[in-house]
Structures are given as C-alpha cells and as structure tokens.
C-alpha cells in the first residue's frame, strides 16, 4: 500500500529527488502515478502555483491546487499560503518548451488519491502522522496527508487543562 505523508516529508528523500531530475523521470512519474513534492515559488494573479523543479518548472493550475477549489468549498487563500512551502502533486504532463522542461501538475489529484486510499479507511482510534500547520486558541490545525487539513481541538490535546495549543505544539512539528 502506498504511504501518504504530510506535505514536507517527501521533498528531501532520494526517491523524490530522482523522480524530479529530468524530463524522462517526470514522464515516468506521470506514467506510474507517483506523488512527488517540490517547493511552490510563486502564486500568480490567476492563483496558479509555480513550482521549482530541479529540471525546470511546474505549474499547478488554480483548479488543480486543492480539493474543493472548483466548487468553492476551499478558498483561494489555501493556495496563496503555499508559497515558499513544499507541496505534493502528481505529474499530469511534461514537455520541453523553448529548451526548458515545463510540467503540468495536480495537487488535487494527489489529495483525491489520499482521501480514497488512506483517509477514507481510517477508523476512530487510529494513530496517524501529522504536521502542525497553524495554531489557534481553540485548537491546532494539522496536515494529515497530501496537504489535507484536520483540527485537533484544545480539549483533546492534554489530560490537564492548557491555556493555548502552543503549550503542547509548535508550527511545523511532526506529531
């Protein structure tokens, strides 16, 4: 079974780096359906994410940026906040344009696969890896796989009473 990790866990792995190194390896990743990671460099005015790839650049069109963008259940701020952070994606296509590799990528496809093959199979009481993405007075938002958000309410964080989630967690922490 394929493993689904919070964003940022795959970016420096040898397997991820190898699959991003050339046009040929990107095409092989597209064929195999591999989920890869790279850093989002820019969010354009149309909210497309431009991703830095070792062999060129990738483009995640706005409607491929996250589950729920098309139907409005996810707001555009979810894309804008990904700038300068690792994002997961699947390669849709890759080609040479003007001597440089340009790849069309889909973060939504990676998230949909994560939901179908991982999240939908979780049961109450399962312990899963997560990365803390944001702290609020009422709880901690975490990435539970491929950038999919979840909330840990403050009353579920500790046996003893705490005044703020920062008493237990830090942003970026793997839990």
Residue ranges and their predicted role:
Residues 1-175:
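Single-stranded RNA-binding regions, centering on S1/OB-family and related RNA-binding modules
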């Amino acid at each position: 079974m394929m493993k689904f990790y919070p964003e940022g866990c795959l970016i420096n792995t040898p397997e991820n780096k190898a699959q991003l190194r050339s046009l040929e390896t990107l095409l092989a990743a597209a064929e195999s359906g591999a989920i890869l990671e790279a850093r989002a460099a820019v969010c354009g005015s149309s909210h497309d994410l431009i991703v830095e790839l070792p062999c060129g650049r990738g483009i995640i069109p706005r409607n491929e940026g996250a589950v729920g963008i098309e139907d409005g259940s996810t707001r555009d701020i979810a894309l804008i906040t990904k700038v300068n952070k690792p994002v997961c994606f699947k390669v849709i296509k890759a080609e040479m344009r003007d001597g440089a590799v340009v790849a069309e990528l889909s973060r939504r496809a990676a998230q949909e696969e994560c939901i179908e093959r991982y999240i939908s199979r979780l049961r109450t009481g399962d312990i899963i890896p997560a990365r803390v993405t944001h702290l609020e007075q009422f709880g901690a938002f975490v990435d539970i796989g491929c950038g999919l958000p979840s909330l840990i309410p403050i009353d579920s964080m500790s046996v003893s009473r705490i005044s703020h989630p920062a008493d237990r967690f830090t942003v970026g922490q793997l839990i």
